């Protein structure tokens, strides 16, 4: 695994670990607070679990079908006291509190499923202590989800990656769609990086239609640096179509923009080579610099000469 991808995923897993650490503040007691509010999606509600102490606070919000909350009736007007449960494979959230016209709050107690760690261990997922089990219940790491991911034969898949998959949205459907587009989609770290940075099937289809066959590291780098399909369309209109993806990434890193290209065109530089544009940005050859050199009587300046002047310290 290459350095940038590894750093990205380690950061993501650190975020997951931090989530678990914060959750552990009250995990021994398995208690916390909850809120409910209406969702814009018919038949669903937005349910938030809150774990906190004097120093830290951790929220986890999910949008779930109303039918998953046994004991909640949103059809009743006014204020009502409620007791309901939300069952997960990892355990059950037993909640009590109040609702008022479809919104409410209260406290919960988490009852861990004693069989869950053993069932997960049988699938190859180790290290599930009480804190991690609460976290896995909150984000709904089900046995079925674990089986689905194991069946995909992914490299580096462990309990923490499984948690990261649920947090960032790596699913069986997502993996299979990537594979249908020709990617191996076999590395757990890269799949997490894909979701963090927004590598989508739509983006891959756009690139393939444009004649590219990007590898997974290039896709992540494009998203990190903002080489989006929309930006690539702008570059195409500026006259830069079908250039290498690494050059596109270089454009974004060094600030080669459609506006920069237009200004150069107005100064007589019709279509500089991609590597020339990058060199100009690296060394600070700006339209203003070109105009200044011309005002001092320097004419017929090629791009290579301009770059050389800047390297020599002429400003």
Model-derived features: where do they sit?
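General marker for long, soluble alpha-helical cores
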Residues: 2-7, 11, 19-315
């Amino acid at each position: 695994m290459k350095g940038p991808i590894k750093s990205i995923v380690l950061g993501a897993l650190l975020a997951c670990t931090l989530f678990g650490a914060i959750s552990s503040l009250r995990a021994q007691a398995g208690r916390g607070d909850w809120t409910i509010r209406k969702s814009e999606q018919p038949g669903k509600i937005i349910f938030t679990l809150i774990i906190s102490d004097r120093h830290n606070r951790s929220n986890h919000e999910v949008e779930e079908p109303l039918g998953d909350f046994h004991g909640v009736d949103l059809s009743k007007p006014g204020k009502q006291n409620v007791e309901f449960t939300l069952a997960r494979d990892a355990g059950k959230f037993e909640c009590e509190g109040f609702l008022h016209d479809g919104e409410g709050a209260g406290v919960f107690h988490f009852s861990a499923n004693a069989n869950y760690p053993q069932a997960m261990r049988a699938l190859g997922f180790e290290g599930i202590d009480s804190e991690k089990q609460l976290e896995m219940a909150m984000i709904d790491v089900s046995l079925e989800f674990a089986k689905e991911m194991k069946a995909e034969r992914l490299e580096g898949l462990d309990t923490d990656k499984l948690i990261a998959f649920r947090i960032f949205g790596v699913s069986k459907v997502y993996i299979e769609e990537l594979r249908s587009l020709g990617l191996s989609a076999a590395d757990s770290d890269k799949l997490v990086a894909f979701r963090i940075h927004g590598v989508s099937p739509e983006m891959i289809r756009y690139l393939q239609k444009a004649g590219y066959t990007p590898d997974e590291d290039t896709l992540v780098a494009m998203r990190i640096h903002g080489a989006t399909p929309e930006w690539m369309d702008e570059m195409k209109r500026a006259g830069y179509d079908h250039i290498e993806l690494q050059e596109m990434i270089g454009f974004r890193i060094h600030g080669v923009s459609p506006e920069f290209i237009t200004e150069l065109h107005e100064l007589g530089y019709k279509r500089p080579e991609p590597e020339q544009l990058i060199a100009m940005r690296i060394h600070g050859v700006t339209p203003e610099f070109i105009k200044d050199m011309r005002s001092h009587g320097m004419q017929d300046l090629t791009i290579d000469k301009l770059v050389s002047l800047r390297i020599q310290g002429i400003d």
